[in-house]
Amino acid sequence: MALSNDFWLFTRPIAHRGLWGGEIIENSLTAYKAAMDNGYPIEIDLFLTRDNEIVCFHDDNLYRMTGKDSKIYHNTLATLKSLPLKGTAERIPTLQEVLSLIDGKVPLLIEIKDQPNDFIVDKTVEILKNYGGEFAVQSFNPFYINRVKRLAPDFVCGILGTHEKERLSLPPFVKNIIFENFIPEK
């Protein structure tokens, strides 16, 4: 899929982890609703729990946001739901809760975080195939994006990267596609 210059990914500010600050906690349903209410597309980060549920959370360790020093993917959804975010009433939302809240009102930029269980890719694709809103999928893991494209060729996808030096050590198939998906046509 070729993306035009006026595609939302290139023309609109994107609320990273929702619209948060002050009393509003990042990656919370309140932050996502604030972004939606202000018309911003939203970037969300996905992790798979120990019991194979997808949650929206940025860090792989829970400590910064909950005070519990544990990898998010070592915990069940029930355990995660018992942990308040930064001492508030907010809890870590599931992907399904976020999709139900947003309901296609604003686009979503969905990052699949690198983690030990790559089943997250298949489960994310399965869920997104039934979502009616606009979205794009991204990851630092090129194998995740390759899998997404095999399962859902029509999904808009992109590979995240950090430094030119790292690009030199990428597998050849990644070097061939690294800049194609998120660059608009001239």
Describe the residue ranges of each PLM region:
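Phosphate-group recognition and catalysis centered on beta-loop-alpha active-site segments
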Residues: 1-186
